Design a protein with these regions (language model features):
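N-terminal intrinsically disordered, cationic/polar leader segments
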Residues: 1-133
Length: 133
């Protein structure tokens, strides 16, 4: 079997410091110690593909167990919508959302899934999670 030629593309996404993402707001969870699961499904996620400059569309699903703070919904909507003009790879989207979410509300756990629309006959689903130790 012949080795496959590998090509490493030097494509730049929007630097983190230039993303201008809307801040995530929180409110106090009045029942700390009582574990509940909160699910969000954001069906209109859009970002820009750094390779093609075309829009990428996805459904972002997020499930978390709050600790002492909950995410405020309007700020979450504005945060997700603020990716609209960001050049970013699918894999990086989910990791950035995870990092920002954990930094904002310090949940007991969170699972995030990005279900990206088919592009070039390939469907991409990216998952990441966090568990407070």
């Amino acid at each position: 079997m012949q080795p496959v030629n590998q090509q490493c593309l030097d494509i730049q996404s929007t630097p983190r410091a230039e993303m201008q993402l809307f801040p995530l707001d929180t409110f106090a969870y009045e029942f700390p110690g009582r574990e509940i699961k909160i699910n969000f499904e954001m069906t209109e996620f859009t970002a820009i593909c750094p390779f093609s400059d075309f829009p990428d569309f996805a459904t972002i699903k997020l499930e978390y167990v709050p600790n002492e703070r909950c995410i405020e919904l309007k700020s979450l909507k504005l945060y997700i919508n603020s990716f609209r003009n960001v050049k970013i790879f699918h894999e990086h989207v989910i990791n950035i959302i995870l990092e920002d979410f954990v930094a904002a509300c310090d949940p007991l756990s969170v699972e995030i899934e990005g279900d990206f629309h088919v592009r070039g006959n390939i469907k991409t689903v990216v998952r990441a999670g966090y568990q407070k130790s």
